[in-house]
Regions:
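Glycine-rich phosphate-binding loops of nucleotide-dependent enzymes
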Residues: 1-218
Length: 218
């Protein structure tokens, strides 16, 4: 459920909040409570919710939106225009991005294709861990299926995908593990075969928890 604490967890994992307990391990390193800049250098990328407000730069074209993360990390300070375009073109092909020209405004793309540009932005930095918050928010059904396919493809390539969604169908399609939050705490850690609508609803509404003595009664 919205406000249960899942978004806040991803924010702590990306250095936007301080964690009071637990730890975040990535690529063999303890990343707990590092600042955002340091976490990004350990190949962690983040796609926040509401891409129009938090991810895209509407005044810039597609190519510049694609390269933003690399530039901010200092990975591509002197890259030639040709190399920029070649790199973008490869990601465009790999992600089946539908865009007329890399010079087109990012806002000329559909929601699904904007999201692909944002994902490509982090993949271009060699991100191994992707933190996604409602990755298909505001995207049509056909584009959602493409995003699902892309996430599964990335997982099969060895990427770690941690995503928050309010849609149970997305969890069933994409997740091999599901953490259910209730009032800022993890109420359940479900394996793939345990993920179903009824079980998730019981945990996310507090009717059932991992602690039987605290279960609520209907």
């Amino acid at each position: 459920l919205q406000g249960a604490g899942a978004s806040e967890l991803r924010q702590t994992r990306f250095g936007l909040r301080k964690s009071s307990s637990g730890s975040f391990l990535g690529n063999g390193e303890n990343l707990t409570n590092l600042d955002t800049e340091k976490i990004r250098r350990y190949h962690v990328g983040r796609v926040p919710s509401n891409r129009k407000e938090n991810s895209i730069f509407p005044a810039l074209d597609i190519l510049n939106n694609f390269y933003l993360a690399s530039f901010s990390l200092g990975n591509s300070p002197l890259v030639s225009k040709k190399k920029e375009v070649d790199s973008y073109s490869q990601f465009k092909k790999d992600l089946n991005l539908k865009a007329e020209s890399y010079l087109s405004p990012i806002i000329s793309l559909s929601g699904g294709n904007q999201q692909k540009v944002i994902l490509a932005r982090w993949l271009h930095t060699d991100a191994d861990i992707l933190l996604l918050d409602n990755p298909t928010q505001g995207i049509d059904v056909g584009a959602k299926d493409e995003i699902y396919h892309l996430l599964l493809k990335l997982a099969n390539q060895g990427k770690t995908i941690i995503f928050h969604t309010l849609e149970l169908g997305e969890i069933r399609k994409c997740a091999d593990r599901c953490l259910v939050f209730y009032h800022g705490t993890i109420a359940a850690d479900l394996k793939r075969e345990e993920i179903n609508d009824t079980t998730v609803r019981l945990y996310e509404t507090g009717v059932k928890t991992n602690y039987p003595e605290k279960e609520n009664q209907l």
